[in-house]
UniProtKB/Swiss-Prot annotation:
Transmembrane spans: 217-237
Principal localisation: membrane
Fibronectin type-III domain segment(s): 5-102, 109-211
Biased composition (Basic and acidic residues): 317-326
Top-level division of the source organism's lineage: Eukaryota
Protein's name in the database: Interferon alpha/beta receptor 1b
Localization in the cell: Cell membrane; Cytoplasm, Perinuclear region
Gene3D superfamilies in alphabetical order: Immunoglobulins (2.60.40.10)
Role description: Together with IFNAR2, forms the heterodimeric receptor for type I interferons (including interferons alpha, beta, epsilon, omega and kappa). Type I interferon binding activates the JAK-STAT signaling cascade, resulting in transcriptional activation or repression of interferon-regulated genes that encode the effectors of the interferon response. Mechanistically, type I interferon-binding brings the IFNAR1 and IFNAR2 subunits into close proximity with one another, driving their associated Janus kinases (JAKs) (TYK2 bound to IFNAR1 and JAK1 bound to IFNAR2) to cross-phosphorylate one another.
Annotated family: Belongs to the type II cytokine receptor family.
Subunit structure: Heterodimer with IFNAR2; forming the receptor for type I interferon.
Native source species: Oncorhynchus mykiss
Any one GO biological process: positive regulation of protein phosphorylation
Length: 388
């Protein structure tokens, strides 16, 4: 005869809105790890029928819990849940538990809460708790309402006394709020028929608004004027710098020297356009050094002896020298010619006149030689580069 298998103990339901999970306890020391469990349910009104038709949810599971959310249990229905253990072909007795979602299921908080300032008030928008199929719980709980706790954040936390506001609406505006103050809000779902209450939502804080003070308006205006002034000043300074740079680039204050401007500008009168490069200027320029040397002329100076009257031979020599020097000076040739003409004409010439004429010619000749020597020194020092 097989030993009896003990039953599961402490059947408990974990619920929230329409989510249901059945849990139980089991002593692992009795059978080890080979035990399995089976969970079934049936509507309670069918228990009086002779033929009972149980719906199986979990079969031979090794876990000590079973999720009934997908069984589509009606929220207002009453059901009987049962669990048994099985090990080595031996089944334990069934353990039953009654379950009514409307009575036993916990109520969840609002799925979402939002705050929005409206003047010196706050609008609180509340979203209903949701079922497992994402529908509102108000479809199952008709008298569902919300309790709203709100308080000023500037209050002393030690002596905090929040104000309470109950409403079944999804949009609530707490009264008697101050302008430009911070308020915090927490919301709870409630169902008084079965005394169901949810947990509160996380605190949310928002600042109220109101009429803008005149001092604040004046401050905004002053700041705006300062910003505009700075923008205009910066724009003007940037434009001035740009204009100055452009002017200095195209119209510099320092002008080029006149000889460079003559080279850059067109040679035609009244033209300010730069002279274009011609084809001749592109040719290669070759320069050679050219030295100009004057022609060397040998001069002869004949000093007559200190005689009171020159002899006849000296008269002839003087005429000859005058004729030789006629190629160098027009004055000499003229004087010499006049002397010859005088002799050829047979006119008598006095000795004292000839001596004076000869001395005058020698003095003129010496002065001409001095000028020529000075010109020779200047020519020797000058060197000119000639482009070929």
């Amino acid at each position: 005869m097989l030993a009896e298998l003990p039953q599961p103990q402490n059947l408990t339901l974990l619920t929230l809105n329409t989510q249901y999970v059945l849990t139980w306890d089991w002593d692992q020391t009795t059978t080890g790890n080979s035990v399995s469990f089976t969970v079934e349910y049936m509507a309670k009104y069918k228990m009086k029928m002779k033929k009972k038709n149980w719906s199986r949810v979990c079969e031979r599971t090794t876990r000590t819990r079973c999720d009934l959310t997908g069984s589509d249990l009606h929220y207002l229905g009453m059901y009987v849940l049962r669990v048994r253990a099985s090990a080595d072909g031996v089944d334990s007795d069934w353990v039953n538990k009654d379950f009514c979602p409307d009575i036993d299921a916990s109520l969840g908080p609002p799925s979402r809460a939002e705050l929005a300032p409206v003047g010196n008030l706050l609008d609180v928008t509340i979203s209903d708790p949701l079922t497992s199929t994402q529908h509102s719980m108000k479809e199952h709980v008709l008298f569902l309402y919300y309790r709203i706790l709100y308080w000023s954040r500037s209050d002393d936390p030690q002596g905090l006394k929040p104000k309470v506001l109950d409403s079944s609406n999804n949009l609530v505006t707490p009264p008697e709020l101050e302008a430009w103050a911070w308020y915090c809000v927490m919301i709870q779902s409630r169902y008084d028929y079965y005394n169901k209450t949810s947990s509160y939502t996380e605190p949310q804080c928002m600042q109220t608004e109101g009429d803008t003070p005149y001092g604040q308006i004046f401050l905004y205006f002053l700041v705006s004027m300062m910003v505009c002034f700075l923008l205009v000043l910066l724009s003007s300074y940037a434009f001035f710098r740009f204009y100055r740079g452009l002017k200095n680039t195209f119209y510099p204050s320092i002008q080029l020297p006149a000889h460079i401007q003559e080279y850059l500008c067109d040679s035609s009168p009244g033209s300010d356009m730069p002279r274009l490069i011609t084809a001749d200027s592109e040719a290669e320029l070759c320069c050679d050094k050219l030295t100009i040397c004057p022609e060397v002329v040998l001069l002869e100076i004949h000093v007559p002896p200190p005689l009171t009257a020159p002899p006849s031979e000296l008269e002839q020599d003087s005429g000859r020298h005058i004729r030789q020097d006629s190629g160098d000076s027009g004055i000499y040739s003229t004087e010499g010619g006049s002397a010859q003409q005088g002799r050829s004409g047979g006119e008598p010439i006095r000795r004292d006149q000839e001596v004076d004429s000869w001395q005058t010619l020698e003095q003129v000749k010496m002065e001409e030689m001095g000028r020529e020597l000075a010109d020779e020194r200047d020519l020797d020092e000058g060197v000119v580069d000639v482009c070929v």
